[in-house]
Amino acid sequence: MNDCSRCAGSTSSGPTHWSGRIRDIADFPKPGIVFKDITPLLSDGPDFASALDEMAQPWRTTPLDAVLGIEARGFILGAALARELRTGFVPVRKPGKLPGRTLIQEYALEYGTDRIEMHEDALPRGARVLIVDDVLATGGTLRAALGLAAQLELEIVGAAVLVELLALQGRSKWLNDVPLLATLSY
């Protein structure tokens, strides 16, 4: 178990000095959606480093074998976080993007379904992993990553997201006994 007392079932305590680097884009990717754009944060080295440090802090003493980063912006955060935590990185991709044999997990969208995949030999059974994504919205993608990890019989020590959209209640799809850190919440 880790010492992630601030992330078990809750979000962080409030905005940080870099939170202004996340901007709202109205009507993207479709009308009625307000998109949380993290690219201004990514382009500012010191603020990006501060955000990563906040994401990493609760997991620094947790033994990990890898970070699972969910496509696409979860790759950016996940790979950087894996380096910060001195562990491996495993990409969780959209269908048909990984060569070789993959495991597939389907999940529900508002209208229809989608899938994510990872290599079936990415990690040995029992490996300890942290799942990372940029935004927790409805929780479908994060829940699908849990399904992939379960197929490989991985031990999920927790999940970390940069932003949680509270109104969409994605946290309700997460496991109650597995810590979930949202560095910022809106």
Curated annotation (Swiss-Prot):
One GO BP annotation of this record: adenine salvage
Gene Ontology cellular component list: cytoplasm
Keywords, comma-separated and alphabetical: Cytoplasm, Glycosyltransferase, Purine salvage, Transferase
Enzyme Commission number(s) of this protein: 2.4.2.7
One GO MF term attached to the UniProt entry: adenine phosphoribosyltransferase activity
InterPro entries (alphabetical): Ade_phspho_trans, PRibTrfase_dom, PRTase-like, UPRTase/APRTase
Pathway the protein takes part in: Purine metabolism; AMP biosynthesis via salvage pathway; AMP from adenine: step 1/1
Subcellular location: Cytoplasm
Main location: cytoplasm
Catalytic activity entry: AMP + diphosphate = 5-phospho-alpha-D-ribose 1-diphosphate + adenine
Superkingdom as given in the UniProt entry: Bacteria
NCBIfam families with a match to the protein in the record: apt, PRK02304.1-3, PRK02304.1-5
General function of this protein: Catalyzes a salvage reaction resulting in the formation of AMP, that is energically less costly than de novo synthesis.
Subunit record text: Homodimer.
Similarity field: Belongs to the purine/pyrimidine phosphoribosyltransferase family.
Protein name in UniProt: Adenine phosphoribosyltransferase
Organism listed in the record: Xanthomonas campestris pv. campestris (strain B100)
